[in-house]
């Protein structure tokens, strides 16, 4: 499985934790079991082919969105530091089933962003990030990149089949 769309990024390894090989993960998944339940995961460094790794255990830091995980074979801080920066992946066929109106954030990548007022093109969703809540990274038509909070009030309509979402940004948000 090597095609880009065959994988689902569930987080990024952002730092070593302690001396016993634990690693901090910034999640891009709303499913905690992906960071807690043992089993097969995959690591990807930059654009290299993903490599298999076995998650041994994990826990969420109290009051934070960061998880601390341990992998089989990563037993000290040096080994943990050697995998920092990698993306944590699962095969895309492991996407959980969603209820009506729910979305996998990764499915929003590449969608056209349009204004709710007149349907005119604003730009394209090029990335997702988290800063307390989910943010869409949108490259505007004129080339500038902006962060849009992914909340119903600002992103009221999403049409995955037609490849667009509507945004209703508060005044000044696109000028930041």
Swiss-Prot record:
Keyword rRNA-binding attributed: no
GO biological-process terms attached to the record: ribosomal small subunit biogenesis; rRNA processing
Location in or out of the cell: Cytoplasm
GO MF entry, a single one: ribosome binding
A GO CC annotation given for this chain: ribosome
Keywords: Chaperone, Cytoplasm, Ribosome biogenesis, rRNA processing
One Pfam family in the UniProt entry: RimM
Chaperone listed as a keyword: yes
Positions of the PRC barrel domain: 99-173
InterPro entries, A to Z: PRC_barrel-like_sf (IPR011033), PRC_RimM (IPR056792), RimM (IPR011961), RimM_N (IPR002676), RimM_N_sf (IPR036976), Transl_B-barrel_sf (IPR009000)
Function: An accessory protein needed during the final step in the assembly of 30S ribosomal subunit, possibly for assembly of the head region. Essential for efficient processing of 16S rRNA. May be needed both before and after RbfA during the maturation of 16S rRNA. It has affinity for free ribosomal 30S subunits but not for 70S ribosomes.
Domain comment as written in the entry: The PRC barrel domain binds ribosomal protein uS19.
Subunit structure: Binds ribosomal protein uS19.
UniProt family annotation: Belongs to the RimM family.
Protein name stated in the entry: Ribosome maturation factor RimM
Gene for this chain: rimM
